[in-house]
Amino acid sequence: MAAGVRANRLAKPARPTQAPARVIHFYGLTQAPGPSAESFRDLKGVDGAAPVEPLACAGLICWISRVPEAEFAENLSKNMQDLDWLAAATIRHQQVVSAIAQAGDVLPARFGIEFLNDESLRSHIESRDFFQWL
């Protein structure tokens, strides 16, 4: 009987894998229309994988990547204590800011500014309180 139970357990269909939750990593602002997103299509973001994207915000362009929430929100403080992780992530952040600056004027953001979603970022930019954080 135990073998039958085991066989049934193994026969269960696998659950579909859900994509990991993402947060917004913010690199900086440019004036609209800003550099073309196409110029950065091969550039990888702070996590080494996510593309760099423009996001329209209050008449400006916010440059962002959608990065894993577990790494850049839930565990950011812990990860920042890991000097290897911190060095790699901050270098990638700076490389993105430098690439944007080569295409035009940019107001860079410091490393570690994350938002839950597009609306959260837009709200902060529109409130102008955000500029105290830069």
Residue ranges and their predicted role:
Residues A2-L134:
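An interfacial alpha-helical scaffold signature
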